[in-house]
UniProtKB/Swiss-Prot annotation:
Segments of skewed composition (Basic and acidic residues): 45-58
Protein name per the record: CBP3-like protein
InterPro entries named in the record: Ubiq_cyt_c_chap, Ubiqinol_cyt_c_chaperone_CPB3
GO CC term, one of those recorded: mitochondrial inner membrane
Organism: Schizosaccharomyces pombe (strain 972 / ATCC 24843) (Fission yeast)
Stretches for region Disordered: 43-70
Taxonomy of the source species: Eukaryota, Fungi, Dikarya, Ascomycota, Taphrinomycotina
Record family assignment: Belongs to the CBP3 family.
Swiss-Prot/TrEMBL GO biological process terms: mitochondrial respiratory chain complex III assembly
Disulfide bonds: none
Name of a matching Pfam family: Ubiq_cyt_C_chap
Length: 283
């Protein structure tokens, strides 16, 4: 028997029609007032839906938080900024400071072996009195000796300053050597210039070990290291010249050790006493 024969409505009168539109759970979601089971078990008064505003009115509110415990906006970016200021920024500032001071220190060391106006006395001593040939190898050995004297003071700095200044000074030295190889000797091949730089690096390492051993030992050991590196083991070297160079080394190492850390980092008082003046000074 059909519904029409019984003259029954399609659904009970108290059953609400489905509503399309926005709800508290999201846009355009179909909602029904109740299911067919609710029609059987509940009366129409019980199926009345509560207003969300009424529900919020009776819902207990959380107490306000202490503003001192609430994270500020963009707290992640603020943490990154604090980490940068605490760990990274001081190292970068130290690196820039070391680079600038190392440039001045290297200029003081490199001009001792070049005919500069303010270093003609040292230039004449190394190339005329010592009779060292004016070659790139001789310039490298003389400059390396002055840089080693600077490194003896750099080793006494705090850990971070020691690493920054030592790296900056060595980097400046090898950059200048590479520039001289390309510019003065017209060697444009990176492979050939790299081979020369590797050989010079090995010579530098050996010279540092020799000078360190001589500085901790006697004057005879230091003179032997100077004779082996600067004079390439020549048998006709005057012993008086070796004595003058040993006095020059010890006097300049002593002068730099007397400088305070701040003065040395800022480059104050960083200069070399010429060898001939060192021979007339008693340490």
């Amino acid at each position: 028997m059909s519904r029409c024969c019984l003259n029954l409505p399609l659904r009970p009168a108290f059953v609400k029609q489905p509503v399309w539109g926005k709800s508290i759970y999201g846009p355009l979601r179909r909602r029904f007032s109740f299911s067919p089971i609710n029609v059987i078990n509940h009366s129409p008064s019980e199926t009345k839906r509560r207003d969300p505003v009424e529900e919020l009115r009776y819902k207990p509110l959380t107490p306000p938080q202490d503003p001192r415990k609430v994270a500020p906006p963009n707290s992640f970016l603020k943490k990154i900024s604090l980490i940068y200021q605490k760990y990274i920024s001081p190292k970068q500032n130290l690196y820039y400071e070391a680079t600038g001071t190392a440039r001045y220190m290297y200029f003081e060391a490199a001009r001792q072996a070049t005919p500069e106006k303010n270093s003609l006395g040292a230039f004449e001593f190394w190339y005329q009195k010592c009779e060292i040939p004016m070659t790139f190898q001789s310039w490298f050995q003389i400059t390396q000796l002055h840089l080693w004297i600077l490194h003896t003071r750099i080793r006494g700095l705090p850990k971070n300053e020691k690493v920054a200044f030592s790296q900056a000074l060595t980097t400046r030295f090898f950059e200048d050597m590479e520039l001289r190889i390309h510019k003065d000797y017209r060697i444009n091949s990176n492979r050939i210039s790299g081979m020369y730089l590797k050989d010079l690096f090995q010579q530098q390492t050996g010279a540092i070990f020799g000078y360190d051993q001589g500085m901790l030992g006697s004057d005879a050991v230091l003179a032997t290291s100077v004779w082996r590196n600067l004079f390439v083991g020549r048998p006709d070297v005057d012993l008086v010249i070796l004595e003058t160079i040993v006095k020059f080394i010890r006097l300049n190492v002593y002068r730099l050790s007397c400088l305070s850390t701040d003065d040395f980092i800022n480059g104050k008082g960083v200069h070399f006493v010429p060898p001939e003046e060192s021979a007339q000074t008693n340490i």
